[in-house]
Amino acid sequence: MKIKKQNIVLSILLSSIFLEGLDAFSIFAVPFPWFGVSMLLLIIPTYYVFNFDLTSLNFGSLKYWILYVLTVTIIKAFSFDLEMPQYATSTYSQFISLRVTKIISFFIVVWIIQFLASYLTKDQIIEYIAYIGVIISVLSLYSYFSFFLDFPDFNRTRAGSGGWSQPIQRACSVLRNYGTFREPSFLAVWTVPFIPLNFYLARKNNKWYFLSILPILSLILTRSLTGVISVLVACLVVLLVYLLKTKKLKLNFVY
């Protein structure tokens, strides 16, 4: 059976996002998020193998911004103090390489979304991505309630920012949800963008109102002020954009 090229691109995107959500794990001392970011670079050979057409894609001024950020990063790399933080698990060269890869991967994700928009509807793309948020939220809730239900928690293979692994009962002075991440705040910030996506999808399918409970509960249990503020700001921005679009439509109708 012939594999459609858009399915390959979609699989790479979703796998990358999922691996980014497994922040607390590594294999052969390589963190899963690093694999996730590196997977996006597979788009480059895939582009040549399947001869993707880029003529219809419009990156506008984004490519110039990416070039600027890359230039600043490389220049600063030579003038920065080479001493890494005490609990850093990577060398300075690895840190710079990962940062450059992150910047390039951002550009690749924008390209992927534009490419997929030629084959899938906007709602389909959002739904695929939203399911990743639901899966990570379920895993985080399992980890959190494993303490109460005496279930085995995940065997995390990466240390937290304090330099030691964090069993859930001592994650903080109060029990906090950090799920598949090394810190509760990391989980909170990662979860926030998925909540508006759930409510967007709920406009046409009520099941997303139910599914939105999972990332919201996961966020609340992190007890992260940063995460709560982030979701409030995100919802405010979404509401503002919606109101502006509605107002614009009404003005166009009047005139």
Placement of each model-derived feature along the sequence:
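Membrane-embedded alpha-helical segments of multi-pass membrane proteins
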Residues: 31-51, 96-108, 187-195, 229-236
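Interfacial loop-to-transmembrane-helix boundary motif in multi-pass membrane proteins
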Residues: 6-10, 61-70, 104, 110-154
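N-terminal hydrophobic segments of proteins, predominantly signal-anchor/transmembrane helices
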Residues: 6-25, 40-108
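Juxtamembrane membrane-water interface segments that cap and precede transmembrane helices
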Residues: 18-27, 89, 164-180
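Alpha-helical transmembrane segments and terminal signal-anchor/GPI-anchor hydrophobic tails
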Residues: 245-255
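Alpha-helical transmembrane segments of multi-pass inner-membrane proteins
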Residues: 126-154, 168-245
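Structural signal for the C-terminal ends of transmembrane alpha-helices
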Residues: 43-56, 111-122, 198-204, 236-247
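Transmembrane helix-loop junctions and nearby membrane-interface residues
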Residues: 18-28, 73, 77-84, 141-151, ...
